[in-house]
Amino acid sequence: MSSSETQKMQLYSFSLSSCAWRVRIALHLKGLDFEYKAVDLFKGEHLTPEFLKLNPLGYVPVLVHGDIVIADSLAIIMYLEEKFPENPLLPQDLQKRALNYQAANIVTSNIQPLQNLAVLNYIEEKLGSDEKLSWAKHHIKKGFSALEKLLKGHAGKYATGDEVGLADLFLAPQIIASITGFGMDMAEFPLLKSLNDAYLKYQHFRMRCQRISPMLDEAKS
């Protein structure tokens, strides 16, 4: 029996990280027990030698499960999906499954990396705070427009139907962070706005939103 079979999972996370937020939602939706390990990015705790041993890039989240270390939100969620197939996050229908992958990829490749803390700090340093906000909003709008087109005709109560799926784990944190952190007007994106309304009514999504909103306000002040 491997050590991962018997040891409690540890999640290294930062409260304001939308990437880590995805994993926390997945763990709760699957009903999995885990130990929360806070990593304060503002204090540079992600750059300590101890943390860099877990992820040389210095990013959160990181999941440790026995002797298994995974340092990427999508990789972590796919590991959880295969290791713990109960309460699945991916539908059996191949078209819906592909839609979930595409929506998650738009967030992970075309939105979040271009407006994360490190990138925005660099842009502010080089070009000023006004350009930082303009940059972030430009890439969020571009990604949200693509998501609206992708999910049109496929969304139900949630992104790809009436059951929570992988796509929702990536959309919910991104949408609320865009509204609260960057002042995005979701009236331009009616489908995503409708999804966000549904997320706010769902226990595991709502719990995370209620915690993150005041933290974002504090971080901006």
UniProtKB/Swiss-Prot annotation:
Give all residue intervals belonging to the GST N-terminal domain.
7-88
Superkingdom, taxonomy of origin: Eukaryota
Q: What induces it?
A: Accumulates in response to the phytohormone ethylene.
Record EC number: 2.5.1.18
Q: Which residues bind glutathione?
A: 17-22, 60, 72-73, 112, 116-118
State the top-level EC class. transferase
List the Pfam families hit by this protein, alphabetically.
GST_C_3, GST_N_3
Annotated ranges, domain GST C-terminal: 93-221
Q: Which GO terms describe its biological process?
A: glutathione metabolic process; L-phenylalanine catabolic process
Reaction(s) catalysed by this chain, per the record, are: RX + glutathione = an S-substituted glutathione + a halide anion + H(+)
Q: Which CDD domains match?
A: GST_C_Zeta, GST_N_Zeta
- UniProt GO cellular component terms: cytoplasm
Q: What are the protein's UniProt keywords?
A: Transferase
Q: Name one GO molecular function term.
A: maleylacetoacetate isomerase activity
Record's function text: Conjugation of reduced glutathione to a wide number of exogenous and endogenous hydrophobic electrophiles.
Q: Which family does it belong to?
A: Belongs to the GST superfamily. Zeta family.
Q: What's the protein here called?
A: Glutathione S-transferase 1
Q: Which organism is it from?
A: Dianthus caryophyllus (Carnation)
Q: Which gene specifies this protein's sequence? A: GST1
